[in-house]
Amino acid sequence: MSMPATSTKTTKLATSLIDEYALLGWRAMLTEVNLSPKPGLVDRINCGAHKDMALEDFHRSALAIQGWLPRFIEFGACSAEMAPEAVLNGLRPIGMACEGDMFRATAGVNTHKGSIFSLGLLCAAIGRLLQLNQPVTPTTVCSTAASFCRGLTDRELRTNNSQRTAGQRLYQQLGLTGARGEAEAGYPLVINHALPHYLTLLDQGLDPELALLDTLLLLMATNGDTNVASRGGEGGLRWLQREAQTLLNNGGIRTPADLDYLRQFDRECIERNLSPGGSADLLILTWFLAQI
């Protein structure tokens, strides 16, 4: 499939640098899906609350998406002189083409649609910052991504029409803004909570997988996850948030023995058909930003 043109302007970025960030995006997706055990999510142990996807689907999907991440970076660089609010429209065709390759790789299974949106935004932000010779840090990347999304929630969630999307219904019923709201706000759950939490645990010498699992619990406890709400309504979301917070209050995931609590949580999520996919997407961003 031919890739959409990025821009008429050229980029001065080295291909090796672009590929380095794209590789980090791929590794972030693999790190998340291979992390086990994760409540309600596909991992190395089981398929969580999903009957239509397996671990291998995520591996194929991540590989397909990796090939597109350089395009997001390149577009971010080539559009560096554009007003940030104008960038998102240019990213959409790249995202849709990437999504098409994901669906081809998985025979129609939606494994990483949320990550295409969020990683695409962050990669474009990185390209813009590099092109402008500005520092690439978690904070600058997320604030730049936020500038691309200014007004997105108003435009896409508060619009009233006869054929409301799932996101519009959840916003109007529960006030949840989902991936759009988190992006427009500059990923505060990641920047202010998950990322510092994860880095602190690593600094304390905790095993990286345990640290990431504990960080997932933090995200599950604080995120208004539209994936959960679409499956279990407000009651399902509040239950999942309470259970995750209870585990954190009881000490979180600090030793291999604590994994038993996650396995039980996983069984309960499967019984309730709840999958915190939005929190998984934010965990991908957390790991990705921790590397830059």
UniProtKB/Swiss-Prot annotation:
Does the keyword Nucleotide-binding belong to this entry?
A: yes
Coiled-coil features, chain-numbered ranges: none
Pfam families linked to this entry = CitG
UniProt-listed Enzyme Commission number(s): 2.4.2.52
Q: Which reaction does it catalyse?
A: 3'-dephospho-CoA + ATP = 2'-(5''-triphospho-alpha-D-ribosyl)-3'-dephospho-CoA + adenine
Q: Which InterPro entries match?
A: CitG, TriPribosyl-deP-CoA_syn_CitG
EC class of the enzyme, as a word: transferase
Question: Which GO biological process categories is it annotated with?
Answer: prosthetic group biosynthetic process
UniProt keyword terms in alphabetical order: ATP-binding, Nucleotide-binding, Transferase
Q: Which domain of life does this protein belong to? A: Bacteria
Q: Does the keyword Ligase apply?
A: no
Gene Ontology MF annotations: ATP binding; triphosphoribosyl-dephospho-CoA synthase activity
PANTHER family hit by this protein: 2-(5''-TRIPHOSPHORIBOSYL)-3'-DEPHOSPHOCOENZYME-A SYNTHASE, TRIPHOSPHORIBOSYL-DEPHOSPHO-COA SYNTHASE
What protein family does this chain belong to?
A: Belongs to the CitG/MdcB family.
What is the name of this protein?
2-(5''-triphosphoribosyl)-3'-dephosphocoenzyme-A synthase
Biological classification of the source: Bacteria, Pseudomonadati, Pseudomonadota, Gammaproteobacteria, Enterobacterales
